[in-house]
Amino acid sequence: MRGAGRRVAITGLGVVAPCGLGKEAFWNGLLGPGLNDVGRATEITDWDPSPYYDSPKDARRADGCEQFATAAAIEAMAQAGHLSAEPSRIGTIFGTGVG
């Protein structure tokens, strides 16, 4: 298998989920008491994508899945800090359940 035996380092993690936005909030949401109000557990409420875009226009043009992916990627890169590896050796893995 090509690449077998190579090491991988996970340096950042970004999460946008109904139980929390960001790594810490997500973890606390998983460990928390659950929903207090009757509602949809799969819904992200009070979402504001504007902090993740250069302009409000760009934020409006992006669909929800793109907004969440952008926010998660920015969080992961912030956690990773400065990466000294060659850019061609840096990668991102993105997963979604519905988007």
Question: Which role fits each region the language model picked out?
Answer:
Residues 1-99:
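Conserved "HGTGT" condensation-loop signature of ketosynthase/thiolase-family condensing enzymes
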